[in-house]
Amino acid sequence: MRFAENNRISHRQLYRQMILALLAPFMLCIFGKGGINGISAVTGTVLALILLGFYVILLIRLTPAFDDLVKSAGGFVGRLIGIFFLLYVLLAGGYLLALLRYLVPASLITGVSGRWIAFWAIVACSLGTYKGMQRRGRMAEVSGGLLLGGIVIMLALCVPQAKAEYFMEALQWNEVTGRNIRQSFYGILCAFSAVALLPFLMGDVEKYGSAGKTAAGAILTLGMLLIGMELLLPAVLGYDRIKAESYPVLPLLDGADLPGNVLARFDIIWMGFLLYSLLFAIGSLLHYGHQIIRKAHLGTGRLW
């Protein structure tokens, strides 16, 4: 089904919303200085994906309880749960805005204050907060596949730049220790913490009881892309440089190009994909904040 009816979204739209909202934050923030790098990251990612598959099943079973938190958990506890999730949304949104504030002046538009960029970003994203889940689903239906396909093409174009000596350098088996695997495992779980918001979304999904495979499929897709990046980044840039770069995907984008150097600034296209995903993620957080306020009886959400 391409578009769901009755103000609900289809499983395909759910899948593409998850891809759109999480892809850019993952690509930009997980790797590099203080992040998850090396062969131990691959092992940690695989283990985290297995646990997340079971976690999704639990979240879907909890969906009816999240439809009205006050009714399900009582007035005090229900509102406390709502405040907890609302704080998460605020902190995550602030982090993404800070990321946007840094990336746009550094990579796309020079001479413009990052504060103004963050301000207009939040204004633009807030306009869609009350448009309903189905409109967000249709937006993801149209653009989600393009974004995913574009990122896959970007990775494919970067493969010829890989160097065998860099790749062998990244395969430092002496770093595959229990501690490093635990750190990578924990880091991936933290990165996927936004999955905890699924119960606030599933109520608007057609036949949400059978949407577990779809949500797990989106997580698996993102996980496979992460594993690909964990192997590609050190093979192209070198393991030592990866550990020194705050956002190693940016120099990776600089080197991505079509054969024959068809476009002089091909990296701008890829940066545009990531920027669009970041804006969708911020808009998603605003939408979930509105849902949390309403379902936890914290207000009407009109001022959100």
Residue ranges and their predicted role:
Residues 1-11:
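Short, Lys/Arg-rich, polar N-terminal cytosolic tail immediately upstream
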Residues 10-32, 44, 48, 52-55, ...:
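Hydrophobic, membrane-embedded alpha-helices of multi-pass small-molecule transporters
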Residues 27-116, 120-123:
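Membrane helical hairpin/interfacial module
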Residues 35, 70-75, 171-176, 259-265:
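Helix-boundary and loop/linker segments of multi-pass membrane transporters
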Residues 94-98, 158-167, 235-246:
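Membrane-helix interface motif
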Residues 97-115, 203-225, 284-304:
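Helix-loop-helix connectors at the membrane interface of multi-pass transporters/channels
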Residues 115, 128-158:
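Membrane-interface loop-to-helix entry segments
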Residues 236-266:
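Membrane-interface interhelical connector segments
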